[in-house]
Amino acid sequence: VGLTTTQVGVLTTTQVAALNTSQMKGLTTTNVTALSAEQVAVLSSSQVGYMAAMGLNGLSGTQLSWLTTTQMAGLTSTQAGSLTTTTLAALSPEQLSVLGQAQLAALTSTQVASLAVTQLAGLSSTQLGNFSTTGLAALTEEQVDALTTTQISGFSAAQLRAMTVTAIAALDEEQTAALTSTQVGGLSTSQFASFSTTEIAALSTTQVRGLTVSEISGLSAEQVDAMTETQLSALTTTQMKGLAAADIAGMSLAQIAAFSSSQVAALSLGALTGMAQTQISALTSTQFSALTSLQVGMLNTDQVQALTTTQVAMMTTTQVKGLSSTALHEMNATQLGSLTTTQMAALTATQIAGLDSEQVNDLSAEQIAGLTATQVKSLTTTQWAALDVTQVQSFSETQVGAITTTQMRGLTETAVQALTGAQLGALSTQQVAALSTASLAGLTVTQFQSLAPTQVSALTNAQIAALSPDQLAAFTTADLSLFSKTQMGGLTAAQTEALST
């Protein structure tokens, strides 16, 4: 405007109030320093809004304190964004409290970071929500710590996410408790991971349900273990996928017990491997029965050995099929003994074949009798050798009929000698022909007498030649009539003599 500092200083309030747009914009830093309290007081909000950034920032702290809230409201967003940190520092909380959306959004990160906690305290939650994401990212730990719960609740999820991890970590328990489920769920993985164990434990079930899988998976085992039973029981089946093996391993039995059956079924295979033996054995019948066949299949040997007989007995056939052969091999006699005949019948041929001799010998007669034909065919010669007399005699005629010729050749003398007359009578001609000469030699006269003529006729020359005179004497005339000339010609003198007597 071409006025000197002296001339500006002697302007009347009427003259100051009459300054137009161009004149206000022309005020220099030197000009504005001459303005008195009376002159500043008559400036309209529009006139203040016309002042150039240079002129506005030329006002001293004392002069700035003269600006009314009405005048402050007249600042443009450009002016607000150009205020120096020194100028900002001179403004009172009341003056800042009238700034609108455009003005607050224009504040730079440097300006926001320079605000005193007392100045921030004067801003409403709505005003704080008007800060740009860049501005919010500049909030310091001290500034965030000073925010009220009302102010915190006014931030959008996106705005909170814009804050630094350090700033979020500065939130105290009372502040985090004020966050909505949307706000909590909108935090980044690293931001949520900055919560203390005390803050984690203080989250409401509503807040917990708002967490994302990424947020849960980003927690340390210590943080997860700080969650209460109520919080854990509030996790959705989707959220359960965020728990890792280390998280599960660190949980108390009370925490594990808090999970519902659907939550247990939702555990990832990796998380399930983290369960300790005490945790596995503590699973309730409802929880254990909820495990999928894939989950059961992932149980390691230590976990399988921890299963109680109650848990084993209540396994579904689908779960039983899910057990790995290695895991099944680690079951002790008590555990195996708790398997029902229905469960035994559900085992695959591979699972049956994976049992060792001691385990096979531990099976009850009822369990043996419950084996299917396919399972019987899967028994190895080593397993057959492990069977005792009671077990062998528990096989039904149908089961005996399922024995393969290869298995017949591998049957021990003890096993063959244990067969009842009914079982022997159920053998096919191919099975009879497959019996070893040593096995036949151990049959009693009574057993031989149970053989049908067709079975006798199936005996090979080598088998007949190995029979004792007493065994031959057990054959009826009808049986002997089925012998071929070759078979008869192969008889020893002792055998022939036994027949003649």
Locations of regions flagged by a protein language model:
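General marker for long, soluble alpha-helical cores
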Residues: 1-501
